[in-house]
Amino acid sequence: MMMRSTGRCAFCRPRAARARGAALITALLVTTLAAVLVSGLLWRQQVEIRRVENQREAAQARWVSRGVFDWARLILRTQADALPVTYLGGAWSVPIAPTRLSDFLGKIGIARAEQGASTWLSGGVVDAQSRFNLRNLVNSKPATGLQVNPQAQMQFQKLLSLLGLSSDLAPPAAQYVLTTLLSSVTKGQQAQTGDVASDALAAAQSDGDAVSRESGLTNTPGMSAGDVATQMTRPIQLHDVDDLVAVPGFTPAVIARLRPFVTILPVPTQINLNTAGPEVIAAALPALSLTAAQAMITTRDQAFFINLGDAQTRLARFMTTGETLDGQFFDVTTHYFEIHARITHERAVVDRVALVYRDPRTHSTRIIRVQDARQ
């Protein structure tokens, strides 16, 4: 009996050990799996928390940028109230070095100014009319409607040549601006091009769209029949210099070279002779060389132009021909400005640019558009 019992226990002992080992391994696997799942959930939660924090900090930075825009607008209005001339020596032209927000709040007596210690701001104001406005390439006349401005196109050709670029890029750029303006007419309006056939075709298309709207049946809610027909071929309207990449011949390298000297504003504008660089001034005056423009700017830095007559008198010293300054292209004040703001709040960094219009009569300002600055 003892021999038989001993043999049976010896046989059961390995099975019990194997069962305990399997249970231990299973427990370890379950524990490991649970730890992995929990760590994954915690990691996802941490990522979500960080994402929400980043969104909150970015939103706060954007709110600070709005304050910077309002502050700059106040400076622009104050400057216009004091002097009807826009020149580079004004308070508006002084850039803001990286400064803590708390420093500004403390100076004006804001309570709890120390809360802005983690927020830094910098930026400046740029005279948008110190550059060549590509919108000048197209003008509008009651008799002919929208058409390419040949004088502005020649100015752009000279600017391209002064910058070491091909002047052949000017005609396609002018044509592209014209095409985008003609295609950006809103619903219910017709582009008066001056061509009877074109206007009749536009009127017929408008009537067809009206019939489609009256039927109430459409596969594209919110879009007219004309929109559906042209949405794939309609060029994108220019709002930024980088949009020139859609024009044949304008490579990123060409655009990078052009960027400091050109801009795109909602309407044709004059060049401010008090703020424009020598390349822009020389391009706008066919008989003026780049060297002469640089010499003229040297005298301008000593005393700004008070009006076009003053600029004409001083310009005559640097020109061999009796070319006059056309008020269509030149002025000594500015109505459009770009406000650049860079806000650093905690981990968030926001770069924004606002285009501001200043009324020449009331000096009131309003923001035309705000966009993120392109790096």
Segments from the language model and where they lie:
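Sec/Tat signal peptide C-region and signal peptidase I cleavage site
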Residues: 17-20
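Compositionally biased linear targeting/interaction segments
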Residues: 3-12, 22-32, 36-375
